[in-house]
Amino acid sequence: MLRKSLTLIIVCAMLVAAGLSAQTKVEPAKPVRMTDRTGPNNGITDVPGIEVGSYDKNFTGTTVVLAPKGAVGGVDVRGSAPGTRETDLMRPTNLVDKVDAIVLTGGSAYGLAAADGVMLWLEQKKRGWDVGGGNVVPIVGAAVLFDPGRFGRAFTDRPNAEFGRLAAEAAYSGPVKMGNVGAGAGAVAGGLKGGLGTASVDLGDGVMVGAIVAVNSLGSTVNPQTGEFYADFLEVNGEFGNLKRPFAFNAAQDDALAMATPELGKNTVICVVATNVKLTKAQAQKVSEMAHDGIARAVRPSHTMFDGDAVFTLATGLLDLDTLKQQAVWGNTAANVLKIGAAASDALARAIVHAMLNAQTVGPVPSYRDKYPAAFGK
């Protein structure tokens, strides 16, 4: 009898709990941003010692991130369909400790040729690994995304060495143009027009962290149930324009879009994060690893069998964290790397949103702005 009574009480308690959960919707806690400050450009060029240039033509292009004084490099590749260059060289156990440039480019593996143009341009500037006799070998890492044959162009119409040279010549430390630009010119992300995006984080004490990304993901950057960006909660000071929640029918349309057959094997998110603090190669690699969380926050699913997701880190080393005034704030070395990595993750997620907000509709592939006008009060 006692056993039956206890069973009845437990069942009733479960029913009451189920009823309460059905009536009360509990919103999950949102992660806290690292900071509410960005650099003046809100881009990777806010990092001292970093320049960016892009060149594109006929819906494909190349973006170059230059470190004129060199930078310690790290990289972490988590997609299962990558196309990269010089990633082995950036391993902490390998010799070369300075990187001159990172190339993000369209063209799939063919697009790696754009890095040749950047190398030749740097050689003319005498920037690179000194091999004696007045000769240098520029260290240029690269990652590619798949865009050949899109938007009606020929499959053979893709970036080459000239794209890389022109992008390097255009590099400067000012505001970065976003959207259908450079490596983002032919990008498509989860059924919407992808693009190039950037963002920065000001951690105080002169410490800057920035990110730049070309978004060509298999997964969507948009929650199909709401039409909102997955990474919208990371917005700093209204940088996304204080977007409104789209109408229900827009969300339903995007749900159908998300279920559409994807372009398997034609996707990736390729990124560079940078900071002006001094890091070792191992620490730079750790920052790249942590920055991948920014992709996972902003794109679902991410790091798939069909993506080539890669994150490079450049540390220009103009600041030494051990000499900063606010040592009580910065703490020990491991904690400092944690802060830089967490800031890089936030900046990368926000850069992905900026890429989507600045993209423009091309042919049958709509931009977020055209797909969700209600988000902008239209």
Per-segment meaning from a language model:
Residues M1-I9:
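Bacterial N-terminal signal peptides that target proteins for export
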Residues I9-A17:
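Bacterial N-terminal signal peptides
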Residues A17-K25:
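Bacterial Sec-dependent signal peptides at the C-terminal "C-region" and cleavage site
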Residues T24-A109, A113, Q124-K378:
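A structural signal for small-residue-enriched, beta-sheet-centric alpha/beta enzyme cores
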Residues A114-V118:
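Short Gly/Thr/Asp-enriched flexible loops that form oxyanion-binding sites at enzyme active sites
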Residues W121:
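Active-site catalytic microenvironments for nucleophilic, acid-base chemistry
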